[in-house]
């Protein structure tokens, strides 16, 4: 459960991303595909070369969904319900992949915002991404 401090840390940090969320999302996906090649199996129709338009486009979708979650920290399950249905029933993404992408996103954010990525912010973002992953996998049963 995100504490009031976690919520404040996440909102403040996310606000500093400006218009770069999609860029960072694409970079995190590139990082995940390089570090964990088995994750590519969910994207057989994509050009998975680093920086491809399709990866960037999906990165923007990831960032937009996370922004929706940030804007609804008191009801992340409600905010991401449709996305949870999609991943559980249609895409059938292995839940471990959300953890892999979360880690790659944390690395990307730390690289781009080292001064703001304090240990407290890191912990709050990690809890936030774990919450999102839990929501996205909640309908797998």
Swiss-Prot record:
UniProt modified residues of type Phosphothreonine: 108, 134, 137
Binding site for heme b: 87
Residue positions where N6-succinyllysine is found in the record: 7, 11, 16, 40
Xref: CDD domains: Hb-alpha-like
Positions bearing Phosphoserine: 3, 102, 124, 138
Signal sequence extent: none
GO cellular component: blood microparticle; haptoglobin-hemoglobin complex; hemoglobin complex
Residues where O2 binds: 58
One GO MF term attached to the UniProt entry: haptoglobin binding
UniProt note on tissues of expression: Red blood cells.
Domain of life: Eukaryota
Protein's GO biological process: hydrogen peroxide catabolic process
Modified residues (N6-acetyllysine): 16
Pfam families: Globin
Modified residues (Phosphotyrosine): 24
Assembly and interaction partners: Heterotetramer of two alpha chains and two beta chains.
Family the UniProt entry places it in: Belongs to the globin family.
Function (record text): Involved in oxygen transport from the lung to the various peripheral tissues.
UniProt protein name: Hemoglobin subunit alpha
